[in-house]
């Protein structure tokens, strides 16, 4: 089958969709039956510089049988008998910065923007969103939800900071998405008092004696957000655990992340009744993803808590080559993740 293309923009979009696929539950059903394109149409959205196209619907295309195309025809060939990972969704980061910027817009522009991204009928229908636990590099201030270093049981935990911008912003996105938004949350750093460098910035590590308290912190966040009417689909353990940054950051070796997960975070999620929440590990670049996967998944006590791996695409920041093949290696070695 082929979809005959008149616009290059759709090919770029298709590549993004393919690059974003990997999910534990759905991958098992990828070969459940033959894929049929009968009656299906391709909707083309175009964004182009020096034009009025901004996520603009610019046409529809049909799948049809086709032989050899001409050299000047842009064509994507699809083999329905060959399947890979199942496409889970695409989405956006709903951070403090995006929330604060959103509320600086006029009301009509707010609605236009949220509809364009999250409405499945009038927009492009994002179904996945990520937000931050504590402040991150897309926050205008540095904050946590607990400031008392003696409060290891987190009795003073509160999310008042998020009620002004981030929580209402996420609710707007959820409403536009018809409440079909898979939200996951990630920490950039624990509170400073929990870290070896006593600083939310500049790397540092989680102090071992705060591991139990930090694991409980994730569950407090999830429960607080869900009390506000925001379902949390899952979490990642740590954003970029190998990067010492000027902004919020915290370092974990593969072994440290594995042990924190199996000894603290995983058991605490279960104890707090959050076993159904998905846990994502790594959440960094593709260059080390296979080595990290071996450390996590070769330990059954850690692997049982892991839904999958998250990855970024910054490994070419120093002039290196993007390491796409590492994703294939991980999937081949651990197809159930």
What are these regions (language model features)?
Residues 21-27:
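Bacterial lipoprotein signal-peptidase II cleavage site
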Residues 97-100, 134-138, 189-193, 238-244, ...:
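Solvent-exposed loop/turn segments at secondary-structure junctions
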Residues 1-4:
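Short, Lys/Arg-enriched N-terminal segments with co-localized hydrophobic residues
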Residues 55-232, 253, 259, 263:
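N-terminal catalytic cores of secreted or lumenal carbohydrate-active enzymes
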Residues 93, 130-132, 184-186, 236-238, ...:
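A cross-family glycoside hydrolase active-site/sugar-binding cleft signature
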Residues 6-13:
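Sec-dependent signal peptide recognition
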Residues 212-234, 241-337:
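Active-site neighborhood of glycoside hydrolase catalytic domains
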Residues 17-19:
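C-terminal motif of bacterial Sec signal peptides marking the signal peptidase cleavage site
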